[in-house]
C-alpha cells in the first residue's frame, strides 16, 4: 500500500526519468494551468462522492485528488517538507 511519501517519491522519479506513455509526464507537460484545472475537477468529484456516494468511492476520489496535488507540487518545485511546514 502506498502512502503520501512513497507516492511523491514515485512521481518524482517519473518526473525525472520521463517514461514514455506516463500519465504523470503528460500532466506535467500540461503546465500549472492544466494541472490546476485537474485539481479543481478532482476536488469537485471528492465533494460529490462524499455527499452522494459510498465511503469507498469518496476514498478513491480523495486518492486521485492527492495524486494531482502532488503532480502540481512537482510542477512548482515544491517538496513534501515545503508543505509539511504549513501543517
Swiss-Prot record:
GO cellular component annotations of the record: cytoplasm
NCBIfam families for this protein: histidine_hisI, PRK00400.1-1
Predominant location: cytoplasm
Molecular-function GO terms, alphabetical: ATP binding; phosphoribosyl-ATP diphosphatase activity
Keywords, ordered alphabetically: Amino-acid biosynthesis, ATP-binding, Cytoplasm, Histidine biosynthesis, Hydrolase, Nucleotide-binding
Any one GO BP annotation for this protein: L-histidine biosynthetic process
Gene: hisE
Organism this protein belongs to: Paenarthrobacter aurescens (strain TC1)
Family designation: Belongs to the PRA-PH family.
Pathway: Amino-acid biosynthesis; L-histidine biosynthesis; L-histidine from 5-phospho-alpha-D-ribose 1-diphosphate: step 2/9
Catalytic reactions of this protein: 1-(5-phospho-beta-D-ribosyl)-ATP + H2O = 1-(5-phospho-beta-D-ribosyl)-5'-AMP + diphosphate + H(+)
Protein name: Phosphoribosyl-ATP pyrophosphatase
Domain of life, per lineage: Bacteria
Entry EC number(s): 3.6.1.31
Protein's cellular compartments: Cytoplasm
